[in-house]
């Protein structure tokens, strides 16, 4: 298939397997959830009744009409331990390479179908100026949350976008499913398209 390069009459030939794939919501959801879970610290920790600080001496006598209690570290008391205490753990989920790449292809294909994929000849700035980047994005009409994808990282582009909270800049190597799904429009250079095809082929 061929896609039009924005701002010119030129077209770029792309693979149907990457940009014309059928969308699978289940697959994309699974990969996005796995990617987000892999970023979790997993450091949550609580103390059980055996770990909380406090005496284990019986708090009151056995007889006398009240409820029977032992140590004040029991979960029933304020300041006591937690019954099913959370412990540090990994939230990582295994995702096969084939599944991951298929999900990326499905996302690119859906972006293309929805008209949210914009291909440009080049996307670079002569100087590190946030104002210059804003003007360039306004000219392209990319929406509030654009994702700019280049073949290789550009320092001018990265530093110019750093002060814009909803603008993301990635090179092909740094692409991930969460960034692609969350973008209103993906602006990608023609060279980056070729590199994406090499990666996902």
Swiss-Prot record:
Q: Does the keyword Transmembrane helix apply?
A: no
Please provide, in alphabetical order, the Gene Ontology terms of the cellular component aspect for this entry: ribonucleoprotein complex; ribosome
Q: Which GO BP terms sit in this record?
A: translation
Q: Report the GO molecular function annotations.
A: rRNA binding; structural constituent of ribosome
List the HAMAP family hit by this protein, alphabetically. Ribosomal_uL4_B
- Role of this protein: One of the primary rRNA binding proteins, this protein initially binds near the 5'-end of the 23S rRNA. It is important during the early stages of 50S assembly. It makes multiple contacts with different domains of the 23S rRNA in the assembled 50S subunit and ribosome. Forms part of the polypeptide exit tunnel.
Q: Which NCBIfam families match?
A: rplD_bact (TIGR03953)
Q: Mind telling me what this protein is named?
A: Large ribosomal subunit protein uL4
Species source reads: Xanthomonas euvesicatoria pv. vesicatoria (strain 85-10)
By which gene is this protein encoded?
Answer: rplD
